[in-house]
């Protein structure tokens, strides 16, 4: 059981690599809880600093709120002792508040607040949204800046001042100037998480901006390689990092970019390659075809 404060949990998250497991489905797209639980146990053999259940890689956007709670509860119960499990909240403010409360009831150790659904919002609106979610839970909240919820440094500073349990900022934009402004303004008040697809591509320059960790989707199917990459990054072994980028990460991203939505689909394909299948992706995503799967298998062989 974890009894640490939100700030202590955020510090732990920032000290190592973050696991973002896929969500397992049966052939009819139902949640396969038994397979999911088994996989959380398998991932627990490797040294991640946090587990983000039902996040983007876990197809949050295709899960119902009750399914999200079911996934989070399973992750909490199967994760190794001492490993923080972070749950998602999203959609409109009322739903996000409900999801944050449900996550806390399920035993989660923190909240990742994803962008609101299907609408643009002003900075004032985004600030109000985050404040309501933070007020609804005692858990630490990390905001995910991306898509229709890109937070300015002024908005993040206001939230950091107003919400003691705002503990993290996850960047899914890739705007170096914006990230520099936020880090320069807030320093170690927050834990900074890299959240662009295949975050390993951006890890080297982002480390200089205080982004000490990131969501590793490839950790799902090449966990040791993902950890070796992260440890090389943090120890300053840039030669290893560059070789790994050229040997695996860049060609992997080329394959990922062949179709929209493959950032998630390719992860489940990777699990199929290593004989740990997680089932299909739910529509509207599509699975890789046989040729693409073979290409991915060749890449995985290089780093396994």
From Swiss-Prot:
Gene3D superfamilies: Aldolase class I (3.20.20.70). Pathway: Carbohydrate acid metabolism; D-glucarate degradation; 2,5-dioxopentanoate from D-glucarate: step 2/2. The keyword Lyase applies. One of its GO terms (molecular function) is 4-hydroxy-tetrahydrodipicolinate synthase activity. Its EC number is 4.2.1.41. It comes from the Bacteria. NCBIfam families: KdgD, PRK03620.1. This is Probable 5-dehydro-4-deoxyglucarate dehydratase. It comes from Rhodococcus opacus (strain B4). The lineage of its organism: Bacteria, Bacillati, Actinomycetota, Actinomycetes, Mycobacteriales.
């Amino acid at each position: 059981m974890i009894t640490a404060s939100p700030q202590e949990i955020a510090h732990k998250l920032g000290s190592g690599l973050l696991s973002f497991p896929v969500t397992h489905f049966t052939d009819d797209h139902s949640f396969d809880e038994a397979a999911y639980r088994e996989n959380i146990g398998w991932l627990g053999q490797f040294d991640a600093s946090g587990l983000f259940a039902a996040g983007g890689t876990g197809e949050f956007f295709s899960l119902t709120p009750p399914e999200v709670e079911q996934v989070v509860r399973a992750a909490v119960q199967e994760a190794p002792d001492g490993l923080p499990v972070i749950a998602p909240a999203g959609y409109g403010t009322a739903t996000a508040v409900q999801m944050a409360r449900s996550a806390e009831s399920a035993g989660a150790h923190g909240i990742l607040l994803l962008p609101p659904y299907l609408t643009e919002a002003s900075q004032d609106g985004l600030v109000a949204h985050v404040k309501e979610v933070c007020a609804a839970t005692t858990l630490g909240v990390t905001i995910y800046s991306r898509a229709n919820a890109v937070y300015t440094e002024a908005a993040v500073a206001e939230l950091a001042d107003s919400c003691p349990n705002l503990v993290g900022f996850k960047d899914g934009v890739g705007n170096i100037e914006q990230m520099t402004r936020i880090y320069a303004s807030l320093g170690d008040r927050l834990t900074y998480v890299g959240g662009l697809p295949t975050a390993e591509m951006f890890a080297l320059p982002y480390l200089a901006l205080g982004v000490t960790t990131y969501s590793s989707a490839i950790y799902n199917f090449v966990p040791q390689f993902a950890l070796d990459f992260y440890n090389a990054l943090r120890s300053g072994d840039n030669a290893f990092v560059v070789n790994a980028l050229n040997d695996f990460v860049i060609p992997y991203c080329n394959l990922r970019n062949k179709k929209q939505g493959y950032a998630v689909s390719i992860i489940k394909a990777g699990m199929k390659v290593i004989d740990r299948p997680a089932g299909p992706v739910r529509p509207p995503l599509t699975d890789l075809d046989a040729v693409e799967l073979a290409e991915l298998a060749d890449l995985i062989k290089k780093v396994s």
